Amino acid sequence: MASDAPEVKAPKAKTQKKPKTAPTHPPYIQMVTDAILSLKERDGSSLPALKKFIEAKYGKDIHDKKFPKTLSLALKTFVKNGKLVKVKNSYKLSDAQKSKAKAAAKPKAAPKKAAAPKKAAAPKKAKAPKKEGEKKAVKPKSEKKAAKPKTEKKPKAAKKPKAAKKPAAKKPAAKKPAAKKATPKKAAAPKKAAAPKKAKAATPKKAKAATPKKAKAAAKPKAAAKPKAAAKPKAKAAKKA
């Protein structure tokens, strides 16, 4: 009878599930809106285009092996919630989602502008008194420089104008051009006196040349005496006899 009793199975120990690690990437709606606004396609962005953009920008933070399936499921839920609008095989942002995205982008730029005036804080004014202290330390140096002109014997330099009397040496320079003008005049005078000397030398030469011509004229009568011409008629007379 005891064998017919059903055996009671011992309950299995429940295995503790590993705690899910919080994702380091932003939520899917934020990644999808960023992808659609960055791609700027008129007819909307397709699933492959959105997947490529998200993997390129947030791939390091996504550790889901089934990321393509989870992305497609997320897009379908966003269309049902009215956050996205599906046009054929592409997805666009709804008007409500566009306004949210623009409103989220404006406050990010505003704190940066507010941080700029904070940098221009009063510490720069604290540096100003330090510069004043440095200027005070420099002032005694300038006073010492003001005392130096008393000891400097610069008035002696005023005696140097004695050397300025050297311009009187210009007088010998003026004598030199005067001497140059006198020398050419003296050289021109002897040249004119040399001309009559040449005329005196020409007169004796003409007298000497005239005397030999007269001697030649006296010799000519000696050649004129030819008595031999008279003897020829005697020979002719002998032939006649």
UniProtKB/Swiss-Prot annotation:
Q: Where is the composition biased (Basic residues)?
A: 11-20, 99-111, 156-184, 194-241
Region annotation Disordered: residue ranges? 1-27, 89-241
Which N-terminal stretch is annotated as signal sequence? Answer: none
Residue ranges of DNA binding: 183-186, 203-206, 211-214
UniProt domain H15: residue ranges = 24-95
- Record's keyword annotation contains Chloroplast: no
Region annotation (8 X 6 AA repeats of P-K-K-A-[AK]-A) ranges: 111-217
Q: List, alphabetically, the PANTHER family matched.
A: HISTONE 24-RELATED (PTHR11467:SF36), HISTONE H1 (PTHR11467)
The protein here is known as: Histone H1-II
Q: Which organism is it from?
A: Volvox carteri (Green alga)
Q: What is the lineage of its organism?
A: Eukaryota, Viridiplantae, Chlorophyta, core chlorophytes, Chlorophyceae
